[in-house]
Amino acid sequence: MISITEWQKIGVGTTGFGIFFILFGMLLYFDSVLLAFGNLLFLTGLSLIIGLRRTFSFFFQRHKFKGTSFFLGGVVIVLLRWPLLGMCLETYGFFSLFRGFFPVAFGFLGSASNIPFLSALFQRLQGTSSMV
């Protein structure tokens, strides 16, 4: 069993609220205040979950520099009240940063799902990479 500290539990909640505010801000026609608040909560929660040092080492790796610059640049653009452009930059940066994680996540969802259509879809999205 993996032990989770209280700070990590707070980080999971903060990240969840950040994702909620980002989605709610997009639902309300890219409300810049909700998007900015969601971005700040998401980044704060991520740093609470994995720690500041690991967060900085994740974002500032040499091969992830382009994704990091687009993601953090999008956050700054949203904070400057250009929400549509900022969210486009953030989305591109997010997919660039977490590109290696998606096959693992789809593989897990495919193996955890008992619904035949969804299982086949997630197995197809998984590609060649696997968890084992």
Curated annotation (Swiss-Prot):
Q: Does the keyword Protein transport apply?
A: yes
State where the protein is found.
Answer: Golgi apparatus membrane
The alphabetized UniProt keywords are: Golgi apparatus, Membrane, Protein transport, Transmembrane, Transmembrane helix, Transport
Kindly indicate whether the keyword Protein transport belongs to this entry.
yes
- Topological domain (Cytoplasmic) residues are 1-16, 61-68, 122-132
Indicate the segments annotated as coiled coil, or none if absent. none
Classify the protein's membrane topology as the record does.
Multi-pass membrane protein
GO CC annotation: what is one?
Answer: Golgi membrane
Give ranges for the Lumenal compartment.
38-39, 90-100
Q: Which InterPro entries match?
A: Got1, Vesicle_transpt_Got1/SFT2
Pfam families documented for this protein:
Got1 (PF04178)
Q: Which residues cross the membrane?
A: 17-37, 40-60, 69-89, 101-121
GO BP of this protein:
endoplasmic reticulum to Golgi vesicle-mediated transport; protein transport; retrograde transport, endosome to Golgi
Per the entry, what this protein does is:
May be involved in fusion of ER-derived transport vesicles with the Golgi complex.
The cross-references to PANTHER family, in alphabetical order and at most eight, read: CGI-141-RELATED/LIPASE CONTAINING PROTEIN, VESICLE TRANSPORT PROTEIN GOT1A
Q: Which family does it belong to?
A: Belongs to the GOT1 family.
Q: What is this protein called?
A: Vesicle transport protein GOT1A
Originating organism: Bos taurus (Bovine)
